[in-house]
A protein has these predicted regions:
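Ankyrin-repeat positional consensus site
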Residues: 9, 40-44, 77, 95, ...
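Eukaryotic tandem repeat interaction scaffolds
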Residues: 47, 63, 67-69, 75-93, ...
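Ankyrin-repeat-protein effector appendages
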Residues: 1-6, 95, 124-169
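Ankyrin repeat domain, specifically the short helix-to-loop turn at the C-terminus of the second helix
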Residues: 16-24, 49-59, 87-99, 127-138, ...
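Conserved binding-pocket/active-site segment within a compact domain
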Residues: 100-141
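Ankyrin-repeat boundary/"N-cap" motif
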Residues: 1-4, 26-40, 63-78, 102-114, ...
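A structural signal for the main folded, soluble domain(s) of proteins
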Residues: 27, 76, 88, 111, ...
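Conserved ankyrin/ankyrin-like repeat signature
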Residues: 14, 45-49, 84, 88, ...
């Protein structure tokens, strides 16, 4: 099986058994292997495979055909271990991944944080990472005419996030 599919669909142990030195530098269908590992639906395997690839020096400043960076992909998953997701976000941002990257539908990675199915309290580690960055965009309209701030205002369980976002208006 192709290493990109293993990174996307399989558990960490199977990925390691299929991995060959240098795979972290190869592109599959024009995309970094990190795009595949970060889209793995198993949160534990997503973290372990991505951590392994980052430790191997995989390139992080990459954009896919939809204009998404690695933060868009990671944060668009539905199931998370928030501690691990926060660690990966921190590493990606430290490695230069842009928190304000707009995809082709003008969505910011922050919009995915707003939409996560977790409480403000559970998402606090992500909020801490996000709002210690400079120039956090909260008022950029997506293709549907909504900003992350407007989306958060409509959600009754985003009071803490909303308070932080209003400081960036």
């Amino acid at each position: 099986m192709d290493i990109s599919l293993v990174a996307k669909m399989k558990k960490y142990d199977e990925f390691i058994s299929c991995y060959n030195e240098g795979d972290e530098k190869k592109l599959s269908k024009g995309k970094s292997l990190l795009f595949y590992s970060l889209s793995n639906n198993d949160a534990e395997s997503r973290y372990l495979i991505t951590d392994f690839l980052l430790n191997k020096g995989a390139e992080t400043n990459v954009i896919n055909e939809c204009g998404e960076n690695l933060l868009h992909i990671l944060l668009s998953r539905t199931n998370h271990n928030i501690k691990q997701t926060a660690e990966l976000c921190q590493r990606l941002i430290k490695n230069g991944v842009d928190i304000n990257q707009l995809d082709k539908k003008d969505r910011l990675p922050l919009q995915y944080v707003v939409n996560m199915k977790y409480t403000d309290e559970e998402l606090e580690p992500l909020y801490q990472i996000w709002f210690t960055q400079n120039n956090v965009l909260v008022n950029h309209k997506n293709a549907w005419g909504k900003t992350p701030l407007e989306i958060a205002e409509k959600m009754p369980y985003r009071a803490s996030l909303l308070e932080r976002m209003k400081k960036y208006e």
